[in-house]
Every structure is written in structure tokens, then in C-alpha cells.
Amino acid sequence: MSQNLTADKPSDNNELKPLYARSIINSFSSGTVGPFLGVYAVKLGASASEMGWFQSVSNLAPNMMQMPWGKLSDKIGRRIPFILGGGLVTAALWVPLMFVTSATQLIAVIAVQAVLGSMATPTWAALIGELMHSSKRGMTTAMINRAAAIGSLLATLAAGYLMVMIKGTLQQMFLIPLIVAVVCGLASSLVMILVNEKPHPNNASNGSIFGIRDITRHVNNSPDFMRFTKASIVFGFFMSLSWPLFSITTVNVLNASMLEVALISVIQGAVTIALQPWGGKLVDRVGRRQLIVGYRLGLILVPTFYALASSVYHLYIASVIFGIVVAFGEVAMFAYLLDVTQEELRGTLTAFYNLVTGIVFFVGSLFGGYLANYLVGIYGLVFGLQLAYALSAIGRGIGALTFTTLREPRRYPSTLRKEFREIVQKLPLMPERGPAQP
């Protein structure tokens, strides 16, 4: 294959400690507000089409500038300044959300925050890839994701409880969580100063940071990366189609409280935390492709549950399922992306992947919002949403099959079937019997 894997260098535990700290504190910051932004928009009066714009902007804006940021990072061979700057900007721009009074204002602030803060995303992925041994990417990624999930889970639960207890306007309910998001966001950025990064500029990422021709050439020279990107495009459109509808179902159909909204995220996070260490080890033993396919197939159940839900408890069940597939799937997806990108181009190619999928998510979410608006106008709120969810579920099934075309860039010591067989054999399915008695 044309792409080289990251050099096999051992990860220094002391070097990784700031990454764990950043993951926990940063996810605590986003966890206090992020899970409630869709509900915030709905309570501000957003329609289905406006929720389509909300989700579309939330997906495209973070990815618009990632390619030039990633390319610039590759050119100068530095990651920390971008992670630090992106985190500080993101934290500061939580402040305007304290004063928004309409869904349009909320969308505008989120867009600006996402564009300016996006410099941290491709550089964070590149830094992780550089600091970890290639044979331990799955396990190390799972541990970092687990640390992040713990921070987010605790923050979401605390924020949901506070919002239920605080009486007053919508802005007053969000005031304390937003202040916490600002403080933790600043802290998570400053902790990256502790990482000792040695500059390693290279000439592989040449040309203008806004250049397209050289990026296209690098992508075309990476067939495994291209195949992965194409599969993500197909699945991503149908996956994002249902995103604008989740908050509408939660608030307008099921009348969930802020604490119940928090529990939806917390349950999923708790399940993911419990299973992610095993998921990381499994990814490194059996490879990425099988788990990615299973992950994508499992996501069919999410819009299905939302379509049929008549109680918030049904969404809790969906959160359990989502937590299981995320524990294995997200680790496998991220590890595979690192596997099929060259180290010296990882920032650029990661940003390209995020940009392409972000555009797809933008189109899918916008289409889903307007489609739901049209269907709800004809068939009513519940049945109109159910039809949109059905299209998303069917499309997810078709898109999941495109990941079967992925090629593993290396061999692995086991298979999913072998691992499952070993687990079954260890289970006490039948009591042992002694010798037959006469």
C-alpha cells in the first residue's frame, strides 16, 4: 500500500497523562452544555426545518476550516499551539449563549464557535497518532475516550439536575452550566502546555494551506483512505437525516424534562465507559473492519427506537444499545483512520475526512429537517416524524454494507468469531456432572 503506518514507538505514560487530563476536563466542559443544545433550540421555538439548519451548521461549521488548519499543522510540524488556541476560543464563545433569545441567534453563535475552534480537531487526532504505538492504538484510544466519557457523563448528569432545580427563564437555567463550560474549557486547553512537543516540519504537505490540488493527489494516492471516506459519505447522509428530529421527539412528543434528557446521555455514556476497555483490546486483536460494520448496523436501531417510542424509557433502552455499539465502533473507526493515513499527512487527511463528512452531514441534516417539516404538515407530528425516521433507518442499513469493502492494512492475531467462541466457552452454560451413578 502507498501509505506508511506510524512508526512503532512506545508511548510514554507520562507523556500521555496531559492527554487524559485534557480529555476529561474538555469533555466535562462540553458535557455541561452540548447534550442540551438541541433542546435549547426547540424550547426557543425552533421548527423542524430550523432544527435542520441547527444540525447542519453544527456539523459543517466545525469542519469548514479543518483542512487548512490540518495542513498548516503538518507544514510547521506542531500540534499543541492549535489544540491550545482552538480550546481557548471554544471556551470563550460559550459566553454569548447566555444571552441568546432565538434559535437563529443560537445557530449563529454555534457556527462561529465551531469554525474558530476547529483548529483543535485534526491536530488532536494527529497528536494522538504520534504519541502512541501502532499496535496499541485501539486500546490507548479506548482509554482516552473512556476518560472523556467519564467527564462528560458526570457533567451532563449534574447539569440536568441543576436545570430542573433552578426556576426562572430558559437563560437562567443554562447560566451555571455555561459558566462551568467556560472555566473547564479554559483549563482543558492550558493543561496541554505540559506536553513536551518537538517540532518536526516536513515537505510532504506542501503548497498553500488552502490548496486543493495537492490534497486531492494525496487522497488519490491513499486507496484505503479513499474507500473509507466513500463509505462514510453514504452512511453519513442517512445517519444525519434523523439528527434534527431527536430533540423534537424528546421535547414535543415525549415531553421529557431536562433531567430525563440528561439521563439519555448519561446511560449511553455509562454503558460506553463500562465496555470501552474491552472494546479497545478487541479492536487491536481482531482488527477494525468487522467491528466498524457491526457498529454501523447497530446504529439502525437508534431511529427505530425514536420512531416507536411512547415513553422516555424507550429512549433509555435505545441509549443502552447506542452505548454498546459506540464502545466498540468509535474506537475501531478512529483506529482505522489512523491506520490508513501517513503520519506526515495525518493532520491534512484527517481534516479532509472531517470536511467531506461534515458537508454530507450538513446536507443530510438539512434535508431531514425540511423533509420532516413537510411530512409533519401532511401527516401530523408523530406519524410525520416516524416516516422520516424510517427513511433514515433503511438508508443506514444500506450505508452500513458499504463498509464491508474496507481492507485491513495489517494482520491481526485473532478474529471476531474466535474471540466470541472463547467467551462462550468460558461461560458456565452447563453445570459439570460427576460420573454416572449406578
Predicted regions: what they are:
Residues 2-16, 197-230, 414-438:
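Juxtamembrane intracellular "pre-TM" segments in multi-pass secondary transporters
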Residues 5-62, 224-265:
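Helix-loop boundary and gating motifs at the non-cytosolic
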Residues 53-71, 266-278:
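Central cavity-lining transmembrane alpha-helices of secondary-active solute carriers
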Residues 65-77, 163, 275-287, 372:
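Helix-to-loop junctions at the C-terminal end of transmembrane segments
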Residues 81-95, 182, 290-305, 393:
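Structural signature of the two symmetry-related core transmembrane helices
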Residues 111-148:
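Cytoplasmic helix-loop-helix junction between adjacent transmembrane helices
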Residues 159, 182-201, 399-407:
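C-terminal membrane-cytosol helix-exit motif in multi-pass small-molecule transporters
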Residues 163-182, 372-395:
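A membrane-interface helix-boundary motif in multi-pass transporters
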